[in-house]
Amino acid sequence: MYILFFLIIIFLILFKLNWYYTNFEYYGLIIKNSHIPDFTRWILSDKFIAKEYAKLNGFDVPKTYQLVKFPHQIKFNYKNFVLKPTDLCDSAGVYLIKDNKNTLTNKVVDKQKIIQELQNLRSSIKTEYYMHEYMYNGLIPFSGYIVEELLLDENNNIPCDLKCYVFGGKLHYIAKTYNRRIINGEQKFDSIWLDRNWEPIKTKMIKKGYVYQEIKKPINYQKIVMLVENMGKILRRHCRIDIYVINDKIYLGEFTFFCGARIHTFICNYKLGKIWLDNPDDYHYEDKRLKKLVPNFYNIPN
C-alpha cells in the first residue's frame, strides 16, 4: 500500500512538472509556440528581412554590403564587417571583423578557413540553431549569408547590445550583454538585467555571467522604450528586440522569437512565462508590408 501511494505521489509530481515545463515555463512556451504556423515570426527570423522591416518602423540598421547564397560567393574586401548566416541564431556562424581581425579570437582573417567553417556548420545544423523550421515542414526563408557594416561605439569598440523583452506591446525587461570573449573555444559574456524603469534586477536571471550592478541609463532611453514598445504593438506578439545604441541612434540587432532561454535561471523563466501567458500572442494578425519586403529568390510557404 505504501509503495503504491509513493508511486502515485511520484507520478503526480512528474505530471505537474511536465505540465509546468510545457505550458508555463518560458522555454517550454517557446518550443510549444514554435510549432504554430505564423508567417510573421517565420519571416522575421531572417536577418535581412528583419533589417528591412525595422527600417520601416523607425530603427537604424547597419548597411548591407552583400546578400549571397553560398560561402564561396562572399567577398572579403572590407576592413571592418560582420558576416553571418541569414537564418541561424545563437551566434552560430557569426564573424565580427575589425581591422581584418576576428574580434573574438583576435586572429587575422583567413578567408578559406571561414568558408570551410561555414560549410561545416551548414552540414551539421541542429534545432539549437533555429526553431522556425517547425512551422512550415522544415521550410526556411533563405539559407544564405549577409555581409554588413560593423557597428562601433564612440571608443571604436564593439558596442554592448540591449535585449528588450516585449510582451503585449510593453517592455518588461532589458538584458545588457557585454564583454563577449572566447575561452577555451567557448563563447562567454557578462549580463545585467534591468526592469522597464532601468532598475537592475538583484535576482540572478542567467545561470552564468550575471553581474548585478548599477549602470548608466542611455540619454535617449525614453526613445528606446517608445520605439521597442511601438514595434511590439505592431507585431502583436512577444518578441525579444535586440538593439545597439550608438551616438543616440537606435540600431536593430535582430528580432528574436525563439531565444536561448536554456541559459536563464528557473526564476527568470518563471517570470517570463507568466508575463507571456498574461499577454498572449495574436498569430492571426499579419502586417501586409512584410511580404512586399521578401526578395523573389526567397522561399514562401504555400
PLM region spans:
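Terminal signal-anchor or tail-anchor transmembrane helices
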Residues: M1-L17
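C-terminal active-site "lid" helix and adjoining low-complexity regulatory extension at the edge
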Residues: W19-F24, V245-N302
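Generic beta-strand structural signal
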Residues: F76, V166-F167, V245
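A long amphipathic alpha-helix within ATP-dependent nucleotide-binding catalytic cores
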Residues: M135-E149, Q187-I250
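Short catalytic/ligand-binding loop motif for oxyanion handling, primarily in non-cytosolic enzymes
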Residues: K51, H72-I74, C89-V94, T103-N106, ...
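A conserved helix-loop-beta module that forms one wall/lid of the active-site cleft
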Residues: Y27-N100, L104-K107, K111-Y134
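Aromatic-acidic/polar surface patches that form glycan- and anion
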Residues: F39-K47, C160, K217-I224
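Phosphate-binding site of ATP-dependent enzymes
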Residues: V109-M205
